[in-house]
Amino acid sequence: MQLPFGEWLPDQPNHLKQGANIAKNVYHAKQSYKPVKSLVPYSSNNIGSVCLGAGSFRDGSNNVFNFAASSTDIFQLASATFTSRKGSLTGDSTDYFTFTQFGNYVIVSNGVDAPQYYLMGTSTNFADLSAIATEGTPPTFKVSGVIRDFLVTGNQSSNTNRVQWSGINDITTWESGTKQSDLQDLPGSGGQIVHI
């Protein structure tokens, strides 16, 4: 038996409203609402310490890659098991990780250690991004994102209000003026860059 509930209308005035004010733990379905199911553990395995960042990415062949990071390691989750793909990191419990996908690359940084890359479908372990740099050296940064065809980084260890971007559609180029790669220090007292 289905019980009819009014449409969820939280923004409408209460006077003569025929809709619902509250819709907790449900999602909209055809002419009804369905309950959101309880969370269930995917795996009893864990990374062994506090997770400081995680990301899930899909490559060009639709394969999914799941990663999580602690202060000392970057792990890959596959078949319900975490496997270290990079160890010997030197950050502490306040150095959170940023995971960014650029094409089939996953770029990881915490602002302390050299930024890391993983080529989905090819790499076994993470490696320093500088290992594939052909022009210039990638900065050490806390935050990154993709804007159009550029990997954009910010909050560098040497300058917290600096943004720097790779060459156009090329994360191997970091030399200013080459393939449109460049950097910009943001003037004023706006503080450090916290997100891109």
Where are the regions that the model predicts?
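N-terminal beta-propeller domains
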Residues: M1-F82, G136-I196
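Generic beta-strand structural signal
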Residues: A69, L77, Q101, S109, ...
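An acidic- and aromatic-residue-enriched active-site/binding cleft used to recognize and process polar
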Residues: S71-T72, G111-D113, M120-G121, Q156
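Short hydrophobic/aromatic-rich beta-strand segments that constitute the beta-sheet cores
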Residues: Q76, S84, V108-S109, Y117, ...
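Predominantly a core beta-strand signature of beta-propeller blades
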Residues: F82-S84, P115, T122-F126, L183
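Beta-propeller fold detector
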Residues: S84-S88, A127-I132, E175-K179
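Elongated alpha-helical scaffolds
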Residues: D92-P115
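Asp-box/WD-like beta-propeller blade repeats and closely related beta-sheet repeat scaffolds
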Residues: M120-G145
